[in-house]
């Protein structure tokens, strides 16, 4: 993240002297309200929108501009049982030619009897491919440079069975093309069975327990989820494979302003799994601090513990520790090699209980900044 953006955050968090007079919280609130960043939700607007732009810098993407658009709404204003629905759009463009757009929608209907969750993304990003497994990821001098052209979409409809228990049915689409490959590097992607272009399409079924008080930023509750996705040529996929996802997270309010959050997550695949669909050990949600895509394999397990503290006004901070491992089979997960992760982050409450987050994650021999909307988990 750029020094300009960090300086801006520090000025807001710690104004002194004439700065405090010139940049009073009331004035900043006034500026933010022009962007829709009110600290109160106005259901009469239909969708209560807010926009937050910000510069960033990373070694991979260079200098760029990111924008987060957050909308809060209630499909039925008379529904007092369901939590507020949220629609989040995040986009970026950088000096390296990278650009991307992602969307997340959490919608709650009929006194929380029905839920519709949609996640999607499109991106054109210069990146690297190391290969499968720890052995490949450790060979940094043998990675292949390419531009990832990615399109993903995962809609899911949930129906409540009993209190806090939901059954879901959905679809998963993922298209990835490796473009502009550096021919001076080893031809790793070209050597995969699927080649540079992969299309995966599959049907999924979920069952979960969810009593979180607010999905984008829980203060209390638990979330346990099992998802099975079957990809097959008959469903439009290039290859046939299965994906199993297990997740558990727990949120405990230590006080009115502090929360302890913990999660364990596993992604397990079998069959003819394409290189683009192998689970990753490293992202903006889990194992922060590792280059996304460096470590990938058929099976990945990780866990993290995060302390979240609300400060004065809109400010907050977090700190986390965690670890993860991976392997080509379930039995290989017990090989004893685990990668650590830890870091700290800043939170700015853009909409009621919807944070803009700036995280700095540290891994073994690597680190990274993350600028996103909503908590990591």
Predicted regions and their residues:
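Gram-negative/organellar outer-membrane beta-barrel architecture
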Residues: 41-50, 56-195, 355, 363-377
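Membrane-embedded beta-strand positions of outer-membrane beta-barrel proteins
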Residues: 51-53, 87-91, 116-120, 167-169, ...
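C-terminal outer-membrane beta-barrel translocator/porin domains of Gram-negative envelope proteins
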Residues: 23-24, 192-196, 203-311
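Solvent-exposed loop/turn segments connecting transmembrane beta-strands
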Residues: 55-66, 91-101, 111, 197-198, ...
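Cleavable N-terminal export/targeting peptides
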Residues: 1-37
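Outer-membrane beta-barrel "beta-signal"
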Residues: 204-207, 344-350, 366-377
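Transmembrane beta-barrel architecture of outer-membrane proteins
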Residues: 48-50, 64, 98-100, 148-152, ...
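Short loop/turn motifs that connect adjacent beta-strands in outer-membrane beta-barrel proteins
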Residues: 21-23, 37-47, 61, 75-84, ...
């Amino acid at each position: 993240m750029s020094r300009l953006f960090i300086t801006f955050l520090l000025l807001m968090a710690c104004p002194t002297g004439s700065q405090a007079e010139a940049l009073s919280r009331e004035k900043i609130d006034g500026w933010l309200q022009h962007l829709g960043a009110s600290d109160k939700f106005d259901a009469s607007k239909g969708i209560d929108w807010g926009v937050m732009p910000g510069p960033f810098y990373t070694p991979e993407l260079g200098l760029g501009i990111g924008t987060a658009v957050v909308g809060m709404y209630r499909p039925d204003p008379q529904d007092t049982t369901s939590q507020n629905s949220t629609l989040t759009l995040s986009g970026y463009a950088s000096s390296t030619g990278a650009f991307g757009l992602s969307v997340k929608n959490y919608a709650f209907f009929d006194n929380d009897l029905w839920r519709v969750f949609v996640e999607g993304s499109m991106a054109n990003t210069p990146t690297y491919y190391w290969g499968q497994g720890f052995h490949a990821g450790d060979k940094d001098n043998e990675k292949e440079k390419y531009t990832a052209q990615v399109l993903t979409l995962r809609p899911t409809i949930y129906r409540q069975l009993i209190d806090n228990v939901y059954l879901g049915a959905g679809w998963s689409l993922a298209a990835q093309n490796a473009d502009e490959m550096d021919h001076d590097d080893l031809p790793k992607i070209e050597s995969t069975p699927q080649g540079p272009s992969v299309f995966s399409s599959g049907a999924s079924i979920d069952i979960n327990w969810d009593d979180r008080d607010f999905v984008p930023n829980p203060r209390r509750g638990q979330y346990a989820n099992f998802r099975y996705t079957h990809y097959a040529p008959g469903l439009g996929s290039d290859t046939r494979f299965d994906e199993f996802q297990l997740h558990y997270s727990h949120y405990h309010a230590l006080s009115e302003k502090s929360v302890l959050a913990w999660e364990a997550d596993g992604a397990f695949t079998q069959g003819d799994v394409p290189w683009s669909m192998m689970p990753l050990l490293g992202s903006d949600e889990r194992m922060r601090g590792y280059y996304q895509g460096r470590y990938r394999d058929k099976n990945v397990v990780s866990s993290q513990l995060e302390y979240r503290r609300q400060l004065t006004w809109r400010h907050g901070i977090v700190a986390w520790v965690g670890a993860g491992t991976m392997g080509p089979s379930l039995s290989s997960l017990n090989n004893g090699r685990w990668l650590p992760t830890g870091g700290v982050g800043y939170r700015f409450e853009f909409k009621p209980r919807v944070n803009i987050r700036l995280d700095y994650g540290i891994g073994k021999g690597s680190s990274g900044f993350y600028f996103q909307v909503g908590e990591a988990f």
